[in-house]
Amino acid sequence: MVMPALESVRLGKTRNEAAACLTATVLIAPADTYFLKLSVAVGDVVRLLDDGGKEIFLGSVHELDRDPEAVTLTAYDRGVYLTRNELYGVYAGTGRQIAGKIAGELGVPLEDDGLYRTIVTGPGESAFSILRRAVGEGREIAVRDGALTVTKGGGGAVPLSPERVLEVFGRASMGNMVNRAVVTGRNGRILAAAQNTGDITACGRFQRVIGKSGDPQAQAKAALRRRSLSARVTVLGDLSLRCGGRVEAHRPQWGLEGVYDITAHEHRWEKGVFTTSLSLEGVEG
């Protein structure tokens, strides 16, 4: 595509979806002299390269919308095969073994960084649904460089430089806070307890009582919840910021305090301006 014909390009992904999505709008008025050469059709391959020629998206056109002024195409990468294919049978083993079996059935290579053990069964589920049950909610499932990747959170957080931040919408809540948890037996006797003393001092006590089902002390610790922090941040364009990564910011006046997981990203090229929008969830300290 010739750049003057492009009105906008958006490239994004969320943790709840397996596929990255690219949307591009091509103006018909400046494009009509060579639009026939583009021959854009559903199923066509779409590649997006950065300024250095590195491929940052490879997928195919799934939707085309035309009006008198523009043509908008929507393309997905190979992650779409995880949501558009239902699988059947019983899947059992470690998360890695299940992911490997699914990747083999779909003809996609597997790459991962260590998944925990689980057993998944059930016919008629999408490949993405089975993978999500196998590896848990906190892991990023994607197809990168042609390979199925399942990555866990953690690792270094990228500092958000204040001079690069364009817009912030933040939210903090203690509506789901649990700062004391008690595990009881059949007779009501306390078997284990855990608490966050600092949160109790600052916010008052919010207690949860749980019946025993496993290791009582581990149950009590797992039930504790701190305040929740979330944000939507727009920064100057940065392709290195993407779903599954982490950022860090300490700007209480913006509602940003600490380390955040990136749960969704959208890179936008519009009217000559490149920006990146991030959906963030605070990481408990």
What are these regions (language model features)?
Residues 37-39, 143-272, 278-284:
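Acidic, small/polar-enriched beta strand-loop surface segments
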Residues 31-65, 96-100, 104-105, 236-259, ...:
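Short, acidic/charged, Gly/Pro-enriched secondary-structure junctions
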Residues 28-29, 70-88, 272-285:
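Short solvent-exposed strand/turn elements
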Residues 93-104, 126-132:
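Polar, S/T/G-rich
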Residues 1-82, 165, 230:
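Assembly/oligomerization scaffold segments
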Residues 68-72, 77-79, 110-176:
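Short beta-strand-centered interaction patches in the first periplasmic/extracellular domains
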Residues 67, 73-74, 81-84, 95-96, ...:
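Long, hydrophobic/aromatic-enriched structural stretches that serve as scaffold segments
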Residues 84-93, 118-120:
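Second-shell loop/turn segments in exported
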